[in-house]
Structures are given as structure tokens and as C-alpha cells.
Amino acid sequence: MADIAQKIRNTREDFEERIVEIRRTTKVTKGGKNLSFRVLAVVGNRNGKVGVGVGKAREVPDAIRKALSAARRNVFEVPIYNGTIPHEIVGRQDAAKVLLKPAAPGTGIISNGTVRAVVELAGIHNILTKTSGSTNPVVLAQATVNGLKNLLSLEKIAQLRDITPQEVIYGVKKEG
């Protein structure tokens, strides 16, 4: 029980919220058409924590509340080095692929709107992205999240290669 309370307190941090998409959906039944709304929301602290959530309801405010609540529940940490990601990675979800590449300082965020919302709120300032396949914002956001979740920190990369983090950044000097 204490773990749940701690998780709720953690979600009360100063997260910035962004609504990426509000889509009206219609279900046709024997009695007519039932309207509802689907909302895609992103929350992040611009310091390495970000979450994405989807909410569905008959009214827009209820859908927004559900989406923001789902996004706060799905917050995770992103390794960031010098305002960018440590290495190139591809995130996949269903028919969507998102290529995330580190960029030099001053490059900015080169991306489409959905991916931009996720990486901006994660706190990444310089990144190159390329999307292919599905252009559905929900699927693109989930593909971006999958890519960011699979990033390795500099320390983890150094440990796997059996070198120091400085050698990962600046390269290993060749002898001879």
C-alpha cells in the first residue's frame, strides 16, 4: 500500500502536460450513432522523465482527464547526455517506425508534431528523427516511447564494452 502512495506522490511532481490529439470517434449501432472522444496526452518534467497516455470518454474533459492520468501512470526515465540521446535507436510499434538519432548542440528538435511533443517534454534539446510507416499519432507516440525506453545510458554502454564512459564519448585511442 505504501508503494502505491509513493507512486502517487511521485506523479505530483511539476510535470508539464500537453494534449497531442483529440479525435472524435463514432460507433454505429442499431439505435443510431454513439459519439465519443479519444485523447492522446504527454506529460514530462523536461529533465529526463516523460509519459504518454490515451483516454476515451463520451465528453472531451473526461477523456482529457483520463489521458493525463494514464500518462502520469506511465512515466519513465530517459538517459540524456548534453541535451541529446546517447546513441541512435529505432522504436517500433505496430506499423510505425521512429528513428531517433543524437544531434550536435544547436541542431534543435527535427521531428513531426507527435514525436516532438514526447522528446521535448523528456528534456531532449537536440535530436534528429525520421518516421516511417503509420502516421497515426497514438502509434507514433508509442513507437517513440519504445525507442526511448530501449536507450542505454553511457555508463551501461561503457560497462558492456569494458571501457570508461569518457572513452565512449571521446573514442578509444588506437595504439600503434
From Swiss-Prot:
With S4 and S12 plays an important role in translational accuracy. It comes from the Bacteria. GO terms for molecular function: rRNA binding; structural constituent of ribosome. Residues 15-78 form the S5 DRBM domain. Gene3D superfamilies: 3.30.160.20, 3.30.230.10. This is Small ribosomal subunit protein uS5. Pfam families: Ribosomal_S5, Ribosomal_S5_C. Keywords: Ribonucleoprotein, Ribosomal protein, RNA-binding, rRNA-binding. GO terms for biological process: translation. The N-terminal domain interacts with the head of the 30S subunit; the C-terminal domain interacts with the body and contacts protein S4. The interaction surface between S4 and S5 is involved in control of translational fidelity. NCBIfam families: rpsE_bact. HAMAP family: Ribosomal_uS5_B. It comes from Thermosipho africanus (strain TCF52B). One of its GO terms (cellular component) is small ribosomal subunit. Part of the 30S ribosomal subunit. Contacts proteins S4 and S8. The keyword Magnesium does not apply. InterPro entries: Ribosomal_Su5_D2-typ_SF (IPR020568), Ribosomal_uS5 (IPR000851), Ribosomal_uS5_bac-type (IPR005712), Ribosomal_uS5_C (IPR005324), Ribosomal_uS5_N (IPR013810), Ribosomal_uS5_N_CS (IPR018192), Ribsml_uS5_D2-typ_fold_subgr (IPR014721). Belongs to the universal ribosomal protein uS5 family.
